[in-house]
Amino acid sequence: MSRASLDKRPDEVAAMFDDVAPKYDVTNDVLSMGQTRRWRRLVVDAVGAVPGQRVLDVAAGTGTSSEPYADAGLDVVALDFSLGMLKVGKRRRPDIDFIAGDATALPFADNSFDAVTISFGLRNVNEPKKALAEMLRVTKPGGKLVVAEFSHPTFGPFRTVYTEYLMRALPAIANRSSSNPSAYVYLAESIRAWPDQDNLAQWIADVGWSDVSYRNLNGGLVALHRAFKEGKLEAKP
């Protein structure tokens, strides 16, 4: 079993992200050839939050995924378990509410948010189903979940090339651009170990989310899952 199996130690994963925090965003841009910015924009579009609504961004890291909500004047809370990542985010965007916390035990009351999102972070959670259930708990009735995560390419030949890139090229590139290249070996292994689009959709439904759907990005390199909490979202006065 690889170190990136679903049986993870949260303290070890958090420490790993502490190490990569200073160069995290730059390295991600390099490794994705600039695609991470586009994927994050699509997450914001899928959330579709409007002024007056409150958004929880789980596994927000340095806050790059939270910035568009803050820039739009929304009330966004950026939560992460890596103090190193939060430190970088707070220094860059002091206007965003950064909170240290565990995705499997969210420090919020029931029905606190109009939408909850997690971008490229669910793989790093020790108990992803428990985290999905916690996100459901803190979402208001009628509220929305959006999950962006690396997934499984749908075209066979591309899947083969992608696997080769993950296990060989990605760690080599990270060795030149990251402060902790071994973290990107973990990244490659965790992507390979992650369930495919349909299985993740089933996980989301299993914990109680409704109307689960997903959209493939870049041929399934990334999948954008969306779901709703049963009930009706109250309109703001």
Swiss-Prot record:
Signal peptide location: none
Protein's pathway: Quinol/quinone metabolism; menaquinone biosynthesis; menaquinol from 1,4-dihydroxy-2-naphthoate: step 2/2
Keywords: Menaquinone biosynthesis, Methyltransferase, S-adenosyl-L-methionine, Transferase
InterPro entries documented for this protein: SAM-dependent_MTases_sf, UbiE/COQ5_MeTrFase, UbiE/COQ5_MeTrFase_CS
Catalyzed reactions per annotation: a 2-demethylmenaquinol + S-adenosyl-L-methionine = a menaquinol + S-adenosyl-L-homocysteine + H(+)
Domain of life: Bacteria
GO biological process, one term: methylation
Family annotation (CDD domains): AdoMet_MTases (cd02440)
UniProt entry tagged with the keyword Transferase: yes
UniProt keyword DNA-binding present: no
Enzyme Commission numbers on file: 2.1.1.163
Any matching Pfam family: Ubie_methyltran
GO MF annotation: an example: demethylmenaquinone methyltransferase activity
List of residues binding S-adenosyl-L-methionine: 62, 80, 102-103, 119
EC class of the enzyme, as a word: transferase
Function recorded in the entry: Methyltransferase required for the conversion of demethylmenaquinol (DMKH2) to menaquinol (MKH2).
Family: Belongs to the class I-like SAM-binding methyltransferase superfamily. MenG/UbiE family.
Full protein name: Demethylmenaquinone methyltransferase
Native source species: Renibacterium salmoninarum (strain ATCC 33209 / DSM 20767 / JCM 11484 / NBRC 15589 / NCIMB 2235)
Lineage: Bacteria, Bacillati, Actinomycetota, Actinomycetes, Micrococcales
Chain's gene name: menG
